[in-house]
Design a protein with these regions (language model features):
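Non-catalytic C-terminal accessory region of glycerolipid acyltransferases
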Residues: 2-5, 30, 36, 68, ...
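A conditional alpha-helix N-cap/helix-loop micro-motif detector
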Residues: 94-98, 121, 148, 168-172, ...
Length: 335
């Protein structure tokens, strides 16, 4: 029954929100965000705890402001995502402005493919639709299997409708397909700021230990494709902003695992730089730092705030390429 209700809620969002006038949808998203923030549920409290790592000197009043803005940013993502299938190509092109795009254009021109790695910032579905529409470049991503199957099918159909090739997340088999796409000069996009599986790579993130997927670095190392971190954010305009960061350097020395670790750390550093500039647009409503997971300093110990095995990038397996994650509970996780 719960699975059917979840599926129905997402279906309702896609079928009704896109029919609303845009100003109405914007106000609706802000109202839902403000009401959710006022309830001070687990997701909001976890968001504030995570933001406290990003802005460690912020007083409680500042953290409250950031978390409220964060929930508004998060609901803007959902309102946009429900409306994206109805947007015209012109609306998509006008809806995103990106800095340093030349890193992506130059990388594709080299013919080796490109790996884009993103944190849970802004609206990566809009960014993806912009790439396929403005640049005319299709790309490949992965999605975890969801329950019920009809919900998984909804998200696959949604992203395929935006011009993406969506692979089921099946560890090594997905990795092999992604590598083939890169060798043929294709583009691969992966959300890569959280991986609690055994294959996750430990990094320093805002001064504390966290784990992130090995996949983006492993794909770049194996295929020779450049790895480009990308960060996204909103401002007061209807246009989402973004930045393509410089290519992650491939270490000349070390074994495969050591080189992947260095590249994962450089990717994490790029994510941290973007998040520090726009903390309210980082939609991390789950535990991330290892101290929060193993009872170390900073652990909240709140019931029900345990890591979600179906959450972003949690699937393990050798060569795990990372994952856009799963929708999880409505209003709690980005897909």
């Amino acid at each position: 029954m719960k699975d059917k209700l979840t599926d129905a809620l997402y279906g309702l969002g896609w079928s009704t929100v896109k029919k609303l006038p845009e100003p109405v949808a914007v106000r609706l998203g802000q109202r839902i965000a403000d009401e959710t923030w006022k309830r001070r549920g687990k997701g909001v409290l976890r968001l504030e705890a995570n933001l406290a790592r990003v802005v460690p000197d912020a007083p409680p009043s500042r953290l409250a402001e950031l978390s409220r803005a964060g929930m508004r940013s998060y609901l803007r993502y959902w309102m946009e995502s429900f409306r994206l299938p109805a947007w015209s190509p012109r609306r998509i092109q006008d809806g995103f402005d990106v800095k340093d795009l030349h890193y992506l254009v130059d990388g594709l021109a080299e013919g080796r493919g490109v790996v884009l790695a993103l944190p849970h910032m802004g609206n990566y579905d809009l960014a993806g639709a912009w790439v396929t529409t403005h640049l005319g470049v299709p790309f490949t991503t992965v999605a975890e299997r969801l329950k019920p199957e009809s919900l998984y099918d909804r998200f696959v159909a949604y992203r395929e409708g935006l011009g993406m090739e969506v692979l089921p997340h099946q560890g090594g088999s997905a990795f092999g397909t992604l590598a083939r796409r890169l060798r043929s000069g294709g583009l691969v996009c992966l959300v890569a700021d959280r991986d609690l599986s055994a294959s996750g790579v430990e990094v320093s993130f805002f001064g504390e230990r966290a784990k992130m997927p090995a996949g983006p670095a492993a794909l770049a190392l194996q295929t020779g494709a450049p790895l480009l971190p990308v960060t996204l954010w909103y401002d007061e305009s209807p246009v989402m902003r973004g930045r393509v960061h410089p290519p992650v350097e491939v270490p000349a020395d070390g074994n495969r695992a050591e080189r992947i670790a260095v590249m994962a750390q450089e990717t994490a550093d790029a994510f941290a730089a973007g998040i520090a500039e726009h903390p309210e647009d980082w939609h991390m409503l789950q535990r991330l730092w290892l101290a929060d997971l193993d009872g170390g300093p900073g652990a909240s110990g709140k019931p029900g705030d345990s890591p979600d095995p179906g959450g972003p990038g949690n699937s393990g397996g050798p060569g795990d390429p990372g994952s856009p994650g799963s929708p999880g509970r409505p209003g709690m996780e980005k897909p």
